[in-house]
Amino acid sequence: MNLLSIALRNLRYRKLASSLTALSMALGVALVVLVLTISGVIEKSLERTSNVGYNLIVGAKGSPLQLVFNTVFFLSQPIENVPYSYYMEYLPADGRLKEHARIGGELKEPQRPGLYSFLMQGGFAIPVCMGDYVGEFRCVATTPDYFGLLKHGDLNDREYKFSGGRNFVDYSEENGYFEAVVGSQVAQSMGLKLGDEIFASHGTESGETHGQGFRVVGILEPTGSPNDRGAFVNIEGFYLLEGHVAPDRDEDSGLEKRGTAQAPQRSGALSKVRLPIEKREVTAILLKPNGFAAMSMEKQINKTKFAQAVSPIGQIEGLLGVFVRPLRWALLALTSLVVLVSAISILVSIYNSMNDRKKDIAVMRALGASRDHITAIILLESLLIAIAGGLVGWLVGHALGPLSNAWTMPTTGVKIDWLAVQSSWELWIVPGLVLLGTLAGAIPAMVAYRTPVAKNL
């Protein structure tokens, strides 16, 4: 009979104590794996999402992180709005003229280039309005360029594709300004299909629901980004909803009344009247300046009194460095203490059994087993408990992660794969268990090594 078989038989003889000790080790390792997995997924998700296809977000003065959370992750509330005319400062002269002709309204010097247009050559600016909800999901009002110009993916090289339908357009004869594209998670959670109508609620999930709906003309393929949780509507239709006119600018504009666009219009020719420029505001502007102009533009914008420019990558890296990574190390320290206590319990369990095993050890010595053999058996017992508990804990830790997908997917868009190794630190678990098992078995092994044969026969 080899040493491993003897060690296994000894553990079976003390199966209750051995099982409980292994269970405590499994619990500690499961907690370590869970912390590494979830923190790794969150960190990679944040890093991937920060590569959003644009360099800067421009919005009202306030918290830069709040602006990023609201615009990129749809998790916070808008700070304030900026005038639509300010968005047009990023357009060239011909762009301003076309926008003025398309929308109408009051605009000073529409023929001149925008203040920042010289830094935008070859780039783009996309307006975004937020503040409403579609069910539990954020309503994002924007232009068709959101899915036409932006890309996604780890390398920011993947175009947005639709599992069904198409991108919304500025105006269609069938739906007017009231078309929408929904993310994959929105469609799945709300049971939406092409042709369905969605209704935005004002301000909060439980706010007053607007009477005018948006027709779903496209459903995005899953992207693994927050856009899976967005309901994207045509910004032109969004402006026509009640309560979406700039404050203190409610005078007659050629519209019957704020928010007078109603669903019954669909049966006939739809009104092409747009909200004038002076009555419009935007929550954020997504900018991709020309070449290396982002840094210069960010400084210039931040010198103004009412607007700020924020780099999403910089803010997310700051969040990771200040909050996510330190929290991960703190949780790892706590869970590692659980593993250490489990290793001590292995030591105590085997050590307490030594008095009952002195006669067995003496008999084995009398039958020809050397002291080294006895020491090796005790160390093997300790290693088997540590490794068996650790493997069970590893499996449990990876199994618990995906169970949280029911919560993390709808709220954050983060999906946890049960076998994915999210951190290189996880590769040190097995060597660490071997070391802990060896150290835990060292003292009992020394006791066994020194057990006198004659005295215990």
Task: Name what the model sees in each region.
Residues 391-432, 442-455:
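Short helix-loop junctions at transmembrane helix boundaries
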Residues 128-129, 133-145, 153-252:
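Hydrophobic secondary-structure segments that place a key small or acidic residue at a functional site
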Residues 3-12:
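A short amphipathic helical element positioned immediately N-terminal to and/or at the very start
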Residues 338-345, 351-405, 432-436, 444:
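Transmembrane alpha-helical interface segments in multi-pass membrane proteins
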Residues 36-149, 274-275, 297-301, 305-308:
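Hydrophobic, regular-secondary-structure patches
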Residues 23-25, 328-349:
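Internal alpha-helical transmembrane segments of multipass membrane proteins
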Residues 94, 117, 208-213, 219-328:
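Mechanotransmission and gating elements of multispan inner-membrane complexes involved in transport
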Residues 17-41:
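Short, strongly hydrophobic transmembrane alpha-helices
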